[in-house]
Amino acid sequence: MLFSRPPARLSWILAFQPSQKLPRYSPRFFSISVSRFAIDMEAVDTTKRLSSLRQLMREHKVDVYIVPSEDSHQSEYIAPCDGRREFISGFSGSAGTAIISLNEAALSTDGRYFNQAAKQLDNNWTLLKRGVEGVPTSQEWITQQAEGGKVVGVDPALITGAAARSLSDALQKSGASLIGVSQNLVDLVWGNDRPAPPREKVRVHPEKYAGKSFQEKVSDLRKELENKKAAGFVISMLDEIAWLLNLRGSDIPYNPVFISYCIVTPTKVELYIDDEKLTPEVKAHLGDDVIIKPYDSIFADAKALFEAKKKDPDAPSSKFLLSNRASWALNLSLGGEDHVEEIRSPIGDAKAVKNEVELAGMRACHIRDGAALIEYFAWLENELVNKKSTLDEVDAADKLEQLRSKQELFAGLSFDTISSTGPNGAVIHYKPEKGSCSVIDPNAIYLCDSGGQYLDGTTDVTRTFHFGQPTELEKKAFTLVLKGCIGLDSAVFPKGTSGFALDVLARQHLWKEGLDFLHGTGHGIGSYLNVHEGPVGIGTRVQYTEVPLAPGNVISDEPGFYEDGKFGIRIENVIMVREVQTTHKFGERPWLGFEHVTMCPIGQNLIEPSLLSDSEIKWLNDYHAEVWEKTHKYFENDEVTRKWLERETRPISK
């Protein structure tokens, strides 16, 4: 279902023959006890919701029902109306899959959310911890639940074609089948309480910030179509549509995108969007180059494209291009595997390589953003230490947003601010809530992960401070994380190197102590777009081996360490890939490195200088000198902030 309005009926069923069974897992064996940390994320009682859902499952002859996190566009962050997984499970993290059988319910999520999920899931649910040895994957758990020829159902608009095929193959081995259920069953349970779809106005993103006209971008895409002899490209990723057409929106919190689809063929561009979202300025911007069509007509039009192609004697072998992240429903509407070529999106690849205008904007917005952060941390220390004020985590986050909002070209936050004191910092994607969050303890570690949206760029920065006297353990852990951050920032590598290959640089010092962190080291960042952007990144994900880093990529460098129930440490800078000069040119190939653009001091009293090498101390002192040089002018009339900045950027030595 697309929002509250279903598309044309989808009745695709994949049936399979019985085969060998997977090992049986005890459903409750993998549940975990709730960790103790000072936040109040009470579990929602899901008993009635699950009972209603199971009744609908019986009516639709479904034995196991899958509820993904994503919307119809496979978005990581979604509009409130698409929060189906949170509604049915009570878990509010951004990543996870809910699986409901007629007798059991499980939630699979990754290491960022283990603590949060354990707290928010009630006793109806089993927590499946991804990547933990001995814990079944979501697919394994589904397959076990479906043994004996049972039927697994999913809304085909919420799962990719690749994921559907992979699950189908696994189910075949256990004698089960997968069906697409066009009417989303969770929506039926949610009923009138489900939030309305967003109706925000779309805005033009001027070329002075985009660096390239949308007509040029479409022309580049058509060259890709020509090279592949493709009938067209059907685009479903919201940030790709926004980037391609130089438009921005407000349909998804913190992500300046708008709910839409787009089809580009060799002769036309069609944008599928609710017309009421388009202002006269946007329509003038698009002009005659883009045809506007109703959002709901995408599936019917996709099917019509397929039918027309079948009748075209000149294009019997041409296929439609579709992102490998597009929905199963869209794939099937275009005729399925025989008529669709699923690829890594050429728009995603192009968007990840920022042009010179975008890179200049990223540098500029990070300086302004750094000024806001510096003023914030100086204010926070003064309030806690000198004034002995009582501030909770939300009070602090609100102050940071206020300071950011004063900066030129500010357009909002890029994600919910993670303002966390003491043990809350160990919850990697902690979200403080007014009334239940903690009072900031000046004698505990304070971790703040935050970011801003600016017309000329997007920021994402984490800093960890201690406003009292840190313990030796805290200082050692912080310094090991800092060494990893410096190691990645300082890397020089040949063209063709992937982020997967560089990940060890951020972890090696922790590994030597038998420590690690359960999240990626770096993710791509959009230019006044989504704060999480593919296809490049730094980490152990297989997809990070597929696309080598290239000049113009903008990514995060964010190693961390988390002591459950005690504290969390993370240092995050945004870095840009650039070509560097080396003494030698082995193989005559280009060599690459990084340029950091985040401008905010790194907490000095948490550093143990004896653990740093001479080159690491030089890096830190050079970095702090750069922060001072680029930001001190903002505080000529602010003595408190200026003195704090002077202290926090002073050179250190062993």
UniProtKB/Swiss-Prot annotation:
GO MF: metal ion binding; metalloaminopeptidase activity
Enzyme Commission designation: 3.4.11.9
Cellular component GO terms held in the UniProt record: cytoplasm
Entry binding sites for Mn(2+) 2: 449, 460, 572
Enzyme class: hydrolase
Cofactor: record remark: Binds 2 manganese ions per subunit.
Recorded catalytic activity of this chain's protein: Release of any N-terminal amino acid, including proline, that is linked to proline, even from a dipeptide or tripeptide
Hydrolase found in the keyword field: yes
Keywords recorded for this protein, A-Z: Aminopeptidase, Hydrolase, Manganese, Metal-binding, Metalloprotease, Protease
Cofactor dependence: Mn(2+)
Family matches, as Pfam families: Creatinase_N, Creatinase_N_2, Peptidase_M24, Peptidase_M24_C
UniProt-annotated binding residues for Mn(2+) 1: 460, 558, 572
Gene Ontology BP term (one): proteolysis
Described purpose of this protein according to its UniProt entry: Catalyzes the removal of a penultimate prolyl residue from the N-termini of peptides.
Family: Belongs to the peptidase M24B family.
Protein name: Probable Xaa-Pro aminopeptidase P
Organism: Emericella nidulans (strain FGSC A4 / ATCC 38163 / CBS 112.46 / NRRL 194 / M139)
